[in-house]
């Protein structure tokens, strides 16, 4: 029993963990149009109005949104877009690129200093002065200050650029404030480009920062003279390099160049400033570089807000001088639909890119048979089991109901068609009734004498044809009553429209021949005769009087035999067929006694 309770408890905990835990926070954001739910940070974020750009990934208040300025413009403290200064003059170089919240900073090019400063630039630049004879350089010239000279010490060689570099006395030379030329043999070893490797440059810089007054280095040549600045400077030697001020480095042209600054809030230092390489800056974590600059980034923007199924594509920024254009207003960078573990930083080295690729290739595939959802971190999360159960149940109910309604509709349609076929059968074309009697009218003497002179053709034409098909009882009776009876007119004279054909008077049940057969159904056959009753005391032998003709006309309706069995319900349209015997001769009417 305890094992069963423990298993039920584990199942309950698994069901609780399968459901998303941040749904209450997500529901609170839906009702507020000024906020939206960020699945990456799992909290509500402020939606910046149109024309403003968020300064962080999930802004919380209107102050976290800033105005979007055009390129080469920055947003000043008064929240206005101001143009950045230009460094288009020949004596100016760019020190700090133009950013979204700071202007571009220009300074005098190497070998010159600024005599008249301006805001973020210099109005007038002059060349560094040269120390006169007997003077050596105390402080080399910078972009802001001129060269400072001092009298040479007795034990210092005037060929060296600084008294800290050389201690050997020499004479007959004039101190100069210009950089010492570097020999080609040592230039490749002393001046190392940044692209070759940052680690080697840092190691070289650490070797060159030894104290110049160290007893182990004074007067002792180094094994690698090109990388050792502490060796003595012999007379006329060109192995001594120029010593730059702090925050300056010696470029490939042998000039001291200012290192870039990472003082902005959205930048961090990636590589420090060395004697032969500049400082390298990159965007802080959570931001990407939209506009790059030399050894830095001009504009950093937050990571785009992607859906739960997508993550941000890592951008390959291993090369420094690669130029990236800013995305248009209102758009976000691309999102990769393929989930990856973690987000790549804004700038990665080739070694880190290879490691990321190897880790991505070793990721195990996720089976697609089970319902899987991707969280903001890219890890698969199984959906709740009851959701799949309810979906299958709803599908089964819908399919079953549709099949039942379809079958029921077909059955009802079949029944309705059967009822319509019984009540409204297909009407067959009935032949036109042509009642023509060519027999001459019989005289009263012939009727009295009982002479029977008849013709078969006249008897066949003198009778009215009965309808071949009757639908309902009322329809058949009305149709028979509507048929007019015509009597044969004597030869040579026109027949009156009110002349009636002579009815056939049969003997009282002496004729056993079948005159007509009424077929009601396939299993019901009724045999009977048609009777024409005459008034008592009257015969057909007398003269045709008007009263007799009216009585015969009024009483000419034939009487059909009644059906003995009651028809079933719904058989109102039973078909009755009248079949007459062929070749049957009508018996002659008997003579009526005259009064």
From Swiss-Prot:
SS bonds (residue pairs): 29-44, 45-58, 48-65, 69-81, 84-98, 87-106, 108-122, 131-149, 233-240, 244-256, 259-273, 262-281, 283-297, 289-300
Residues exposed to the Extracellular side: 19-385
Gene Ontology molecular function terms on file: protease binding; transmembrane signaling receptor activity
Signal peptide start and end residues: 1-18
SUPFAM superfamilies listed in its UniProt record: TNF receptor-like
PTM entry text: Phosphorylated on serine and tyrosine residues. Isoform 2 is constitutively phosphorylated.
Listed Low complexity bias regions: 179-194
Compositionally skewed regions (Polar residues) per UniProt: 346-355, 443-452
Glycan attachment residues as annotated in the record: 32, 101, 276, 336
GO biological process, one term: signal transduction
Start-end of Basic and acidic residues biased regions: 499-509
InterPro entries, sorted: TNFR/NGFR_Cys_rich_reg, TNFR_8, TNFR_superfamily_member_8, TNFRSF8_N
Keyword line: Cell membrane, Cytoplasm, Disulfide bond, Glycoprotein, Membrane, Phosphoprotein, Receptor, Repeat, Signal, Transmembrane, Transmembrane helix
Pfam family, one: TNFR_c6
Residues modified as Phosphoserine: 438, 452
Membership in a protein family: Belongs to the TNFR8 family.
Subunit structure: Interacts with TRAF1, TRAF2, TRAF3 and TRAF5.
PANTHER family the record matches: TUMOR NECROSIS FACTOR RECEPTOR SUPERFAMILY MEMBER 8
Note in the entry: Most specific Hodgkin disease associated antigen.
Stated name of the protein: Tumor necrosis factor receptor superfamily member 8
Origin organism lineage: Eukaryota, Metazoa, Chordata, Craniata, Vertebrata
């Amino acid at each position: 029993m305890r094992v069963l309770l423990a298993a039920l408890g584990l199942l309950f905990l698994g069901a609780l963990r399968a459901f998303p835990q941040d749904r209450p926070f997500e529901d609170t954001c839906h009702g507020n149009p000024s906020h939206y739910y960020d699945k990456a940070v799992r909290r509500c974020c402020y939606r910046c109005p149109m024309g403003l750009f968020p300064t962080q990934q999930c802004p919380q208040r209107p102050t976290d949104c800033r105005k979007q300025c055009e390129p080469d413009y920055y947003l000043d403290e008064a929240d206005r877009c101001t143009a950045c200064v230009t460094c288009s003059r020949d004596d100016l170089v760019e020190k700090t690129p133009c950013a979204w919240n700071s202007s571009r900073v220009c300074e005098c090019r190497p070998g010159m200093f600024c005599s008249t400063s301006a805001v973020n630039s210099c109005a007038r630049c002059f060349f560094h002065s040269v120390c006169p004879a007997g003077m050596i350089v105390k402080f080399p010239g910078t972009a802001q200050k001129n060269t400072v000279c001092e009298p040479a010490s007795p034990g210092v060689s005037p060929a060296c650029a600084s008294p800290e570099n050389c201690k050997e006395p020499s004479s007959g030379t004039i101190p100069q404030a210009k950089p010492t030329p570097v020999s080609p043999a040592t230039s490749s070893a002393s001046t190392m480009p940044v692209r070759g490797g940052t680690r080697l440059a840092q190691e070289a810089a650490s070797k060159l920062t030894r104290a110049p007054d160290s007893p182990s280095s004074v007067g002792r040549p180094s094994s690698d003279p090109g990388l050792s600045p502490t060796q003595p400077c012999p007379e006329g030697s060109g192995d001594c390099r120029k010593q730059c001020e702090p925050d300056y480095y010696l470029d490939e042209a042998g000039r001291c160049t200012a290192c870039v600054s990472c003082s902005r809030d959205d930048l961090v230092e990636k590589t420090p400033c060395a004697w032969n390489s500049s400082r390298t800056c990159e965007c802080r974590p959570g931001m990407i570089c939209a506009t790059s600059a030399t050894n830095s980034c001009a504009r950093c923007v937050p990571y785009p807000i992607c859906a739960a199924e997508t993550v941000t594509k890592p951008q390959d920024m291993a090369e420094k001088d690669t130029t990236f254009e800013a995305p248009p207003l209102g758009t976000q960078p691309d999102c990769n639909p393929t989930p990856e573990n973690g987000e790549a930083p804004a700038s990665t080295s080739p070694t880190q890119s290879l490691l990321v690729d190897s880790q991505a290739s070793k990721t195990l595939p996720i089976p697609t048979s089970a319902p899987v959802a991707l969280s903001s971190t890219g890890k698969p999360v199984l959906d709740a089991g009851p959701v799949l159960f309810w979906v299958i149940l709803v599908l089964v109910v819908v399919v079953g109901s549709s099949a039942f309604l379809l079958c029921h509709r077909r059955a009802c349609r079949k029944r309705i068609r059967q009822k319509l076929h019984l009540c409204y059968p297909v009407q067959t074309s009935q032949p036109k009734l042509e009642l023509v009697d060519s027999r001459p009218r019989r005289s009263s003497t012939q009727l009295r004498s009982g002479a029977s002179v008849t013709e078969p053709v006249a008897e066949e034409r003198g009778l009215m044809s009965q309808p071949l098909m009757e639908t309902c009882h009322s329809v058949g009776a009305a149709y028979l009553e509507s048929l007019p009876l015509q009597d044969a007119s004597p030869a040579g004279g026109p027949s009156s429209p009110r002349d009636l054909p002579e009815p056939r008077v049969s003997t009282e049940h002496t004729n056993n021949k079948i005159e007509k057969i009424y077929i009601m159904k396939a299993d019901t056959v009724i045999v009977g005769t048609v009777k024409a009753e005459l008034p008592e005391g009257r015969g057909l032998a007398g003269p045709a009087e008007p009263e007799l003709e009216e009585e015969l006309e009024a009483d000419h309706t034939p009487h059909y035999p009644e059906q003995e069995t009651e028809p079933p319900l719904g058989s109102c349209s039973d078909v009755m067929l009248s079949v007459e015997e062929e070749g049957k001769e009508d018996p002659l009417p008997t003579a009526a006694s005259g009064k």
